[in-house]
């Protein structure tokens, strides 16, 4: 298995249909939830990445404890975001304890970095989500849901679920918005009038307000 030097954001060789996991997750509930359902390989020196789903797509996982503790997770996100070699999505534990901190991480991840953010209630839910995304990628490798494209596909589960979390959107409006604005970047640059034409004035106000926050 080819691996990166410590603290690297370079590509990783990942066999098709496998997940390469950071050694720190060995024995965790998250890893146990995936074992037996997908081929999991542990590697040292994956910092700042937690899981590689393909050679250029990865997951950055923010635990409840990390979210409550402060903004220490931000450096990891920025390093992957600034890498031209990796496309990362962020999975965050949104629990009763950490829920009050979710708007801040959402603003930083989606608004400031333009990255996909997926909230989960537990590590077991996260394991199911990661398996689902890898299976989606395995079924349709040409429609890799982690790779940023000029035009995103509405069926991409990661992008769709991330947009659903934006205030004022939800499950019904997210596909409509992605048909008109195929990426988070395009959605963030949409005018209030353009948003109103898709989702109506009330939802448009909330969405526009989210993307108009000071950065």
Curated annotation (Swiss-Prot):
Signal peptide location: none
Presence of the UniProt keyword Kinase in the record: no
Biological processes, Gene Ontology terms: interstrand cross-link repair
Membrane-spanning parts: none
Record-level GO cellular component terms: Fanconi anaemia nuclear complex
Pfam families for the chain: HHH_2, PND
GO MF, any single term: chromatin binding
Complex and partners: Belongs to the multisubunit FA complex composed of FANCA, FANCB, FANCC, FANCE, FANCF, FANCG, FANCL/PHF9, FANCM and FAAP24. Interacts with FANCM.
Domain topic, free-text comment: The C-terminal region is distantly related to RuvA domain 2, a DNA-binding domain.
Keywords: DNA damage, DNA repair, DNA-binding, Nucleus
Task of the protein: Plays a role in DNA repair through recruitment of the FA core complex to damaged DNA. Regulates FANCD2 monoubiquitination upon DNA damage. Induces chromosomal instability as well as hypersensitivity to DNA cross-linking agents, when repressed. Targets FANCM/FAAP24 complex to the DNA, preferentially to single strand DNA.
Location(s) in or outside the cell: Nucleus
Protein name: Fanconi anemia core complex-associated protein 24
InterPro entries, per database record: DisA/LigA_HHH, FAAP24, PND, RuvA_2-like
Gene that this polypeptide is encoded by: FAAP24
């Amino acid at each position: 298995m080819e691996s990166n030097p410590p603290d690297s954001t370079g590509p990783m060789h990942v066999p098709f249909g496998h997940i390469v996991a950071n050694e720190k997750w060995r024995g965790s509930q998250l890893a146990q939830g995936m074992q037996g359902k997908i081929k999991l390989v542990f590697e040292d020196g994956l910092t700042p990445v937690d899981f590689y789903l393909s050679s250029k797509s990865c997951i950055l996982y923010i635990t409840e404890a990390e979210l409550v503790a402060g903004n220490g997770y931000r450096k990891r996100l920025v390093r992957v975001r600034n890498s031209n070699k990796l496309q990362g999505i962020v999975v965050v534990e949104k629990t009763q304890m950490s829920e009050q901190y979710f708007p801040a991480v959402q603003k930083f991840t989606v608004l400031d970095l333009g990255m996909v953010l997926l909230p989960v209630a537990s590590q077991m839910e996260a394991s199911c989500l990661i398996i689902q995304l890898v299976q989606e990628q395995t079924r349709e490798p040409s429609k890799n849901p982690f790779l940023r494209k000029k035009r995103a596909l509405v069926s991409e589960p990661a992008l769709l679920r991330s947009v659903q979390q934006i205030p004022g959107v939800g499950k019904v409006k997210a596909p409509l918005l992605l048909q008109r604005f195929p990426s988070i970047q395009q959605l963030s640059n949409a005018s209030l009038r353009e948003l109103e034409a898709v989702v109506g004035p009330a939802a448009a106000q909330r969405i526009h307000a989210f993307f108009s926050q000071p950065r």
